[in-house]
From Swiss-Prot:
Ranges of residues in domain USP: 288-933
Gene Ontology molecular-function annotations: cysteine-type deubiquitinase activity; cysteine-type endopeptidase activity
Domain DUSP residue range list: 7-118
Protein name: Ubiquitin carboxyl-terminal hydrolase 15
Organism placement in taxonomy: Eukaryota, Metazoa, Chordata, Craniata, Vertebrata
Family to which the UniProt record says this protein belongs: Belongs to the peptidase C19 family.
GO cellular component, as recorded: cytoplasm; nucleus
Record: active site: 297 (nucleophile), 891 (proton acceptor)
Pfam families, per database record: DUSP, Ubiquitin_3, UCH, USP7_C2
Disulfide bonds: none
GO biological process: BMP signaling pathway; monoubiquitinated protein deubiquitination; negative regulation of transforming growth factor beta receptor signaling pathway; proteolysis; transcription elongation-coupled chromatin remodeling
Location of this chain's protein in the cell: Cytoplasm; Nucleus
PROSITE patterns in the cross-refs: DUSP, USP_1, USP_2, USP_3
Organism: Xenopus tropicalis
Presence of the UniProt keyword Protease in the record: yes
């Protein structure tokens, strides 16, 4: 283990730094390391420039690698959900991991968290470390109740899984076996491609695999395949789609000859195996569920919403897409996404199935968008954006996109600029997606320096509407009072989301009665102060999992007083070897802050420290009180004259022990990393028993008990000559020289305990005990609801660009924080509204669960359109994607209105049930689909050819020919029927 000198630490730093830059290669193994441990290691080796001053400091020594913070279950070594790279963990290649283990070892009983690098993508390949393995449930055909769970990499093959199952269930090598993929209640699929990977096979989280072996008669218990038929004669097998049988029957006989272990037809990447529930054939078209392939509810929700968008579904059901497939578009997917989507829609609307398994479609999406290739939870809206863009490019009627020179408005009328922008758009983008989903908005930017105004008109496929952000957040903190007898108390405080530490102190003050300026806020981790916050630091740096301790102090930390605040760590000494006299130390317990006079004797400092710990340090004298606790008179400790409220008068004899010295406790002064270092002064060393003196003023009448040994010694760490002067004469006087001693996690006083004395006198259970304030059980009241119009108004509100996303002003020739305003110019036949419920920052992830009240019918958008000739703009709701749960997880479902019967249904993966309009508006609503009323007919399908021809005029506000005849008569009627949202 390397605790060694600066050279060794420099070597560690340089070697690990280089290995962190190792490129990912398919099949390589990388290791997860808890980011908190890694940050501590970086401090110890001086990895970053701001860590140099702590380099080699034994008090920031990280100890053995500890990944317990990443584990949900230490027994199974399963990871917590939704861990984020670099925020929660660091990835290191094998060589880097081995080096760290050789230097620091691993916490006992912990296994390394090793993960493989997998390759994703079809055209643009990229590698990623597969942090979350696929958990599969394994069982035998003869006993499906005996389920064994194992985790596999997506790169593992079916053959590897079979071998693992043979081992688990003790199946002899001579026994023939075959594997089945079992899902839903009674649906099986043969896994007869041993070389296929888990990713190729589309196996998902929680999938159950069944291993079957031949019986004593040499027969398969699940049945055999008749040679005269291409249809499996298994009563327990689901019905397989005819397309899959015809595609695979020709390979049947040759497959049997090649491998007798697998007697069912082979299949092409599991593509065409779509099953219906046995015994159900006559379903209503469109009321077809989608099997969850393992965290794919986000995809199922998106598909159900698109499936119930009438003009798009009619387009695919009528095979119009076949004439418009663009196989050569470099921005498209060679038509594969469109064809796969069409096949899925036809199955869903065939009326043959109560549910289908969208594995083929999922595979195609993963090939072209690697971010969706796994089986982790994803964002439904992000998938919708990809699908709409992918379908558009696959079906783009423009075969060769012309170059378009974009022009600024330059003061021209909006109508002219809008018409020009739309015409330019459809010269390059002309598809069914443009016809149905694309609209136009106006963007106005104003330079704050030169007042340059830039106006552009841009197309959109959906509207992302902001929700008013939560202005507050709840934080749980622990308050440590000056009274040493008071246990720490846990509080829940409500603080501004965009606030600072002073806001936290003010909120805590209202509950505790302690003045904010008498508080110091800290983050404690691994027995040390991870951070000591300044009052002006942002609260966003405090994460939910941080242990925040707020210490009451008797002084304002920023004032020049005759007292100083010192961080105190507790250390337990140990000897490296039985024959070595060199000692090390390890941290334990909770650190604390103590206020002491700038000028203080060593004895008095010792007494103050011991009195500060009197709640959990037992009596050190046989004549102490019977309860065994150190005598603390509350009247003295609270109302006394000393710092922290502790009376300055006190006999050192009460704070010492008659324990005899032994070999393990003779060395009371721990050597610093560098014996000549000026940053660490040792106090209370070997000669303390001879010099336990205090000042003349405070020691009158006190006996000097030099024969008694102290419970601990102490050392000042990272306090240089400009901070502290330690006069090692007869008085042993300590003088803090700086007017404002710096208070941070780097400079502290370490109390070194002998193991035997610690075991006898230090009560760790009492030290960790705390109380709960009633605020902990308080649930903040949330706003009842807001209206959809509030979100639209927020979308069109003028805003100032942030410093991280400035606008380049062509006039100033510089990036400026311009003001920006968006306005709606024209709206599409189907308006997709994305409610921006998720917010992200460097330190925080959050979901807004505000109830947004949106109309089911008659959504009038005329209020928000600045185009006077926009035409009809009343909409009816046709679908909603719902998200339940929090960030990074949860569950997606959908409400949708069937185009044939006009009724609402609830789609929850493979389940479909009737729904009422009262159920639709909820806090879970995430993406809304509205269809314009003038495009709705009896079948839900409108003449798309008309929309194609008149798309440009509709987008720019020019009325259709048919509209001109009826606008005067119908507009008034239509507006009367609309429920205005203002």
């Amino acid at each position: 283990m390397a605790e060694g000198g600066v050279v060794d630490l420099e070597t560690q730093r340089s070697e690990v730094s280089a290995l962190l830059k190792t490129p990912l290669r398919r099949g390589d193994t990388w290791y997860l390391i808890d980011s908190r441990w890694f940050k501590q290691w970086k401090k110890y080796v001086g990895f970053d420039s701001w860590d140099k001053y702590q380099m080699g400091d034994q008090n920031v020594y990280p100890g053995p690698i500890d990944n317990s913070g990443l584990l949900k279950d230490t027994d199974t070594q399963s990871l917590k959900e939704h861990l984020i790279d670099e925020l929660d963990y660091i990835l290191l290649p094998t060589e880097g991991w081995n080096k760290l283990v050789s230097w620091y070892s691993v916490v006992e009983s912990q296994q390394p968290i090793a993960r493989k690098v997998v390759e994703q993508g079809m055209f643009v390949k990229h590698c990623k470390v597969e942090v979350y393995l696929t958990e599969l449930k394994l069982c035998e055909n003869g006993n499906m109740n005996n389920v064994v769970t194992r985790r596999f990499s997506k790169a593992d093959t079916i053959d590897m899984i079979e071998k693992e199952m043979r081992t688990i269930f003790s199946i002899p090598d001579e026994k023939e076996t075959r594997l089945w993929n079992k899902y839903m209640s009674n649906t099986f699929e043969p896994l007869n491609k041993p070389e296929s990977t888990i990713q190729d096979a589309g196996l998902y989280q929680g999938q159950m695999l069944v291993i079957e072996q031949k019986n004593q008669e040499g027969q398969w218990p699940r049945g055999s395949m008749p040679k005269s038929s291409g249809i499996p004669n298994f009563s327990t097998l689901p019905k397989i789609s005819p397309s899959s049988l015809s595609n695979n029957y020709n390979n049947f006989n040759s497959r049997i000859m090649k491998n007798s272990n697998y007697c069912l037809p082979s299949y092409a990447a599991y593509k065409n195996y779509e099953y219906s529930e046995p015994g159900r054939h006559n379903e209503q078209p469109g009321l077809c569920g989608l099997s969850n392939l393992g965290n794919t509810c986000f995809m199922n929700s998106a598909i159900q919403c698109l499936s119930n968008t009438p003009p798009l579904t009619e387009y695919f059901l009528n095979d119009k897409y076949q004439d418009e497939l663009n196989m050569d578009n470099p921005l498209g997917m060679r038509g594969e996404i469109a064809k796969s989507y069409a096949e899925l829609i036809k199955q869903m609307w065939s009326g043959k199935y109560s549910y289908v398994t969208p594995r083929a479609f999922k595979t195609q999406v993963g090939r072209f968008a690697p971010q969706f290739s796994g089986y982790q939870q994803q964002d439904c809206q992000e998938l919708l954006a990809f699908l709409l863009d992918g379908l558009h490019e696959d079906l783009n009627r423009i075969r060769k996109k012309p170059y378009i020179q974009l022009k600024d408005a330059d003061g021209r009328p909006d109508k002219v600029v809008a018409e020009e922008a739309w015409e330019n758009h459809i010269k390059r983008n002309d598809s069914i997606i443009v016809d149905i989903f694309h609209g136009l908005f106006k963007s106005t930017l104003v330079c704050p320096e030169c007042s340059k105004i830039s106006v552009t008109f841009d197309p959109f496929c959906y509207l992302t509407l902001p929700l008013p952000m939560k202005k507050e957040r709840a934080l749980e903190v622990y308050l440590v009072r000056m009274d040493p007898l008071a246990k720490p108390m846990q509080y829940k405080v409500i603080v501004p989301k965009i606030g600072n530490i002073m806001d936290l102190c003010t909120a805590l003050s209202s509950l505790s009665g302690i003045a904010p300026e008498k508080m110091v806020v800290t983050d404690i981790y691994n027995h040390r102060f991870h951070r000591i916050f300044a009052m002006d630091e942002n609260l966003s740096s405090i994460m939910e999992r941080d242990d925040i301790y707020v210490f009451e102090t008797s002084i304002n930390r920023t004032e020049d007083t005759e007292q100083v605040i010192i961080p105190v760590y507790l250390r337990e000494k140990f000897r490296h070897t039985s024959y070595s006299h060199h000692h090390g130390s390890t941290l334990f317990g909770q650190p604390f802050l103590i206020t002491v006079p700038r000028n203080i004797t060593e004895d008095k400092l010792y007494n103050l420290l011991l009195l500060r710990m009197c709640r959990y340090v037992k009596a050190t004298n046989d004549t102490e009180e019977n309860d065994g606790s150190l005598h603390c008179n509350k009247e003295h400790t609270v109302n006394g004259n000393g710092p922290n409220g502790i009376h300055e008068e006190g006999s050192p004899s009460e704070m010492e022990t008659d324990e005899p010295d032994d070999e393990s406790s003779q060395d009371q002064e721990l050597p610093s990393e560098n014996e000549n270092s000026q940053s660490e002064d040792s106090v209370g060393g070997d000669n303390d028993s001879e010099n336990g003196l205090c000042t003349e003023d405070t020691c009158k009448g006190q006996s000097v008990t030099g024969q008694k040994k102290r419970l601990f010694t102490f050392q000042f760490s990272n306090l240089g000559s400009s901070d502290i002067t330690y006069i090692k004469d007869d008085t042993k006087y300590i003088r803090f020289d700086e007017r404002q001693l710096r208070l941070d996690e780097r400079s502290y006083l370490a109390l070194d305990w002998d193991p035997k004395l610690k075991k006898k006198f230090f009560d760790e259970n009492a030290a960790e005990d705390f109380e709960k304030h009633e605020s902990v059980d308080f649930t903040p009241q949330k706003k009842a609801f807001m209206k959809l119009k509030d979100c639209i108004e927020l979308f069109t509100t003028k805003e100032k660009l942030g410093a991280e996303d400035p606008w380049y002003c062509p006039n100033c020739k510089e990036h400026q924080q311009a003001t920006k305003k968006l306005d709606l110019w024209s709206l599409p036949p189907v308006l997709v509204v994305h409610l921006k419920r998720f917010s992200y920052s460097r330190y925080m992830r959050d979901k807004l669960d505000t109830l947004v009240d949106f109309p089911i019918s008659d959504l009038d958008m005329s209020t928000f359109l600045i185009n006077p000739n926009a035409g009809p703009c009343c909409y009816n709701l046709i679908a909603v994607s719902n998200h339940y749960g929090g960030m990074g997880g949860g569950h997606y479902t959908a409400f949708a209105k069937n185009k044939d019967d006009g009724k609402w249904y609830y789609f929850d993966d493979s389940s479909v049930s009737t729904a009422s309009e009262e159920q639709i508006v909820s806090k879970a609503a995430y993406v809304l689909f509205y269809q314009r009323q003038d495009t709705i007919t009896g079948t839900g399908f409108f003449p798309l050819d008309k929309e194609v021809k008149q798309g440009a005029s509709a987008a720019t506000g020019a009325p259709h020919e048919s509209d001109e005849e009826s606008n005067e008569d119908e507009n008034d009627i239509e507006n009367e029927n609309c429920m205005h949202t203002n």
